[in-house]
Amino acid sequence: MQKISAPVKVFLWLLLVACMLILAKNILFKGRSGYERADIKKAFTSRGIKKRFAKANLKPFTTIRLFYKSRSLNTEYKMGNLVGNVVGFIPLGLLLPLLFNWKRGWQAVFGVFLISLSFELAQLLFALGVFDVDDLILNTLGGLIGYIIYWICRSIVRHQRKQEVAIN
């Protein structure tokens, strides 16, 4: 793959920062106007920590199955949660291999997994949400989809360049 020019690289970094800020707002600060001092104090009490660990979903596909089977939950809410967890991380699957010149798909997918894990741990540790392994699965799937899109685009560009070279 051809080297990315400095201005394009800066633009890609700005996109990554924007994506991370949007994800942080939607994952960590959803529905909050501010993180109060009282919230911080509660977050670090032993009772608060135990409560968050008790609420954490560590069993894969529990939330996904619940959403699939539930008749009482609003369909828009269920789809927004499931699809949002996937779609929100697609840009990372596209941007990470471009910014870090990762040649193998597992590197990009693992990078997305680590970012998702960071968000989930932040929710758990700072009482900003509930840790859910299903979110990790869906976020990582989004990263994989993003990488597949990157790979397809890269293949098309390579093919076009080969054709241009063959013509010249």
Protein language model features and the residues they cover:
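Bulky hydrophobic segments
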Residues: 1-128, 151-168
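Alpha-helical transmembrane segments that form the membrane-embedded catalytic/substrate-binding core
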Residues: 127, 131-150
